[in-house]
């Protein structure tokens, strides 16, 4: 059944708590999906910033183009072209991260009270954004295999939804990657029913294969796929640079997007352009991907060992570094979250990934940090709590 609810705003206070905890340095961070500083190419970033400042022009220190610096837009266009995705620099709008990009385009394409379709479980930040913008959320179920395209077509055809918000490559929290056939079909459905698909492709460069998967945008013929992303997950969460790509068919929205966009830090834009042109970013990705795969596999092995004797479901992501854990229904993820906080561990309870409590016995873990002794101890502590809970309910 399709689910239409509006109770996400009731969780806003809890979302604020989640964001507060993810910045505390004294916690074991298994919650927010972010790379370990050890995986960030700090020296390459420093060199790029120095070169960008050295070769900058006087006009680079004035208010810059709201669309983003031309050098960065050109660099991104050429970078994507190497992976088979062709987007012109003039169609790229630089934003201060992926969430601002999503917010911009949602406000341009839809109005307060419009319904947005989201496959769930879905990144809680997206759901929070939709709720804060007073858009209604219509959920269709996603699984480790991807999205039910028959259900997606049924909703598009019904005319109930104004747009869809989805991730095709290494979705958070499930980690699936849709096939090229499925992506092409989504683009065709969007055109057939004139329903915009806002594609969040933030994890595309975090796959376990060296070849980057193509986004839905690749098959877009009529401009109904709006492509968004950033380098927050592939480079550094502190590097607040993202984009939204508006095709020629959407030029009527251009003025609204530009007026709503905050000017992004110019030196950082130039530094990212330098990182791309110097090949340092490509080298970083080639190094990052196998390390992520190894790291995620280590987490999976340790989690299965720690929870031995407990019937759990554990995601098998093809990329990214989110892990989605399902426990027996007696286990309450929110209760586990509070237990973890009391013991200096940060996790994310499953119920914030959908509008009702169907994911209450799930949690999401971050595998972006190396599997340290401290993290192993934290996983052991969670496993011990789960086993005690199950023993008490059985007795």
Where is each model-derived feature located?
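Conserved core segment of the aminotransferase class I/II
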Residues: 45, 221-290
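Pyridoxal 5′-phosphate
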Residues: 30, 160, 304
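N-terminal helix-turn-helix DNA-binding module of bacterial transcription factors
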Residues: 1-2
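Conserved core of the PLP fold type I
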Residues: 56-193, 198, 204-222, 390-394
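Conserved glycine-rich beta-strand-loop-beta hairpin in the small C-terminal domain of fold type I
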Residues: 289-300, 312-326, 336
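N-terminal small-domain helix-loop-helix segment of the aminotransferase-like
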Residues: 5-97, 277, 346, 389, ...
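Conserved PLP-binding active-site segment of the aspartate aminotransferase-like
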Residues: 246, 324-329, 347-385
